[in-house]
């Protein structure tokens, strides 16, 4: 499950003249002790995106997880693309969170870079779950148009691929339109990406999930050395 999303991203990254970055074998593919859970990771870089990572967790019929985060280079003030998609097989429930995660919360910045998410939400009513917004800090690294779905098998089969494709294509089109930085310079962009990693290191809900499957030692290393690598940077 979700292999089609991985392939879709790889195709788009390839079209950006991106290349795969070699990562530690313990992150590339890792099994828990009884091999019921397998995690696979990919890391890419391109002229436009300094880091684009993909994670797939295979828990068989019980759980499937897909995550991707794209960091623009430090010359671009664009938001960070973030997507978390989870399928709970036992309860037949889909949870998806898709957002252009803003570096700042200034209204004009949000309107310029994030508001087009609203158009996508209008097309897919099941992915407009405002009831769950309170679990995310809207004053930090989430946009007012964050796409949230708490759906079912129908949403998984019928809607997910289409909305994910629209979500990624729209984001790439924003970059292709070559917007001029209006709000942040390169140093401020770097600082805000560092702050994003520090915030995510503290708040990411996947921490507990990974610890329960793969143990605390591996999870701590994985979060620091793969997921949020700027977490240890010092802001001057």
Curated annotation (Swiss-Prot):
Keywords of this entry: Oxidoreductase
Pfam assignment, any one: Fe_bilin_red
GO annotation (BP), single: phytochromobilin biosynthetic process
Enzyme Commission number(s) of this protein: 1.3.7.2
InterPro entries on file: DiHydbiliverdin_OxRdtase, Ferredoxin-dep_bilin_Rdtase
An MF annotation (GO) of this entry: cobalt ion binding
The reaction(s) this protein catalyses: 15,16-dihydrobiliverdin + oxidized 2[4Fe-4S]-[ferredoxin] = biliverdin IXalpha + reduced 2[4Fe-4S]-[ferredoxin] + 2 H(+)
PANTHER family from the UniProt entry: PHYTOCHROMOBILIN:FERREDOXIN OXIDOREDUCTASE, CHLOROPLASTIC
Family affiliation: Belongs to the HY2 family.
Role, per record: Catalyzes the two-electron reduction of biliverdin IX-alpha at the C15 methine bridge.
Protein name (Swiss-Prot/TrEMBL): 15,16-dihydrobiliverdin:ferredoxin oxidoreductase
Gene: pebA
